[in-house]
Amino acid sequence: MASTTPSKLLENAMKYADQPALSTPSVDGWVTETWAEVAECVMDIARALVGLDFNHGDKLSLYSYNCKEWYGGYLAAQMVGGAGVGVYHTSSAEEVEWVVSNSESKVVFVGNNPMAAGDNSKMPQHRLMEVIDALDKVEHVVLLPGVGGVEHAKLMTWNTFIGHGSSIETATLHERMGALTEEDTSALIYTSGTTGNPKGVELTHGNFNFEVKAADFAFTFHQGERYVSWLPLAHVFGQLIDNHYWVDKGLHMYVADNPLNVVDLAKEVQPHLFIGVPRIYEKLYSNVRAAIDGKAILRIGLKLPLLSGIFRKILKKKTGMKACRFAVTGAAPINPDILELFQSLGIPIFEGYGMTEDTAGATLNYAEQNRVGTVGTVFPGTEMKVADDGELLIRGPHVMKGYYKNQTATDEVLKDDWLYTGDVGTIDGDGFVKI
């Protein structure tokens, strides 16, 4: 049997059965589920998919912000031989129509958009209803718990959906998992170019496996350590860490109720691992600078060796980084001043580089090998070179299978196993990459 994230999930359910795996927000506070409970949820969803004739190669679109059912559906689709297709919770009706149609999704999960600000027209179920009749390949639309207000022949509630799996034996799920290979597609992630419709990047179980293991050269986390899920799961970074890395390392993941609340959530949870983008670190940077500049004693404390440790702890706690052992920034350039300040405070934020087409990461700085102003050195097992025109090329086991149903576009960027990134960069004598 190929090594896959669903098979690792079942291992966790045995090894860490009663250990916390997932904490989701509710009106009464956090609801925490163990690895055994998460695995049972995934298997219930997998049974239901099989009961709806979801077969090898079929696609499940997930149109929602981060939630338990998103993770569960994604892993369940993979468990039974299919693939997950993330749809941004903020996507317009036209964008949803393209992704769901182009991916040939058989089933669609519809959930919440916490950024709708009370505007029902921006909620996923209403936007999907605008285009549902054009989605002829969609056989079933499943409303996640708490979602309603719409009617259509293809719709079903969550409880009705789960009921479709009542007669499916657990042995059937194990048979499906046993038939998986590392070359099987596990996800389609849609990425926008400068022109035309988004392209579906086809990533395999092997792509994700390599990426998860390769990260160990820079950081290693252990069962039970805390992580905050806030990046939209339709994004490759969120999908990699919040699904595959979470399960592989057995992290305790806390889910944000809204991506706008991530800073406050980090302060509450004090995660060991944090994944962000420059705008989040810019906000943290502004808070730290204000604290330093606004209080003379803090400015003195940061300069005096006897006091610096005390004030560093205060500032790390205020930013939600008291327990943080590694934080990553990527997706866009970051001001080097931000990295230098945080690193001087003992907050290990490092810049990396990658793209959807290489399963998120290709280079990374880390404590033992860090050069601010660069995006670090390549992952072990990854090759990178600069073409004659300055374009960066990447080769390795994390490079995509191709663009789904778009051989022309695939041939433009994959040549002799090299991925043409479209980014201009340099590689210095020590192997550090600069974009």
Descriptions of predicted regions:
Residues 52, 378-435:
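Conserved ATP-binding/catalytic segment of the ANL
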Residues 32-36, 186-212:
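Conserved AMP-binding A3 loop
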Residues 2, 18, 22-75, 92-97, ...:
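Conserved AMP-binding/adenylate-forming core of the ANL superfamily
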Residues 58-59, 65-93, 98-107, 225-226, ...:
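A short helix-loop-beta submotif of the ANL/AMP-binding
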Residues 65, 110-129, 271-341, 351-358, ...:
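Adenylate-forming
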Residues 18-20, 143, 156, 160-190, ...:
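Conserved pre-ATP/AMP-binding loop-to-beta segment of ANL
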Residues 81, 209-226, 233-314, 323, ...:
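Conserved AMP-binding/adenylation subdomain of ANL enzymes
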Residues 10, 79-163:
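Structural core segment of the AMP-binding/adenylate-forming
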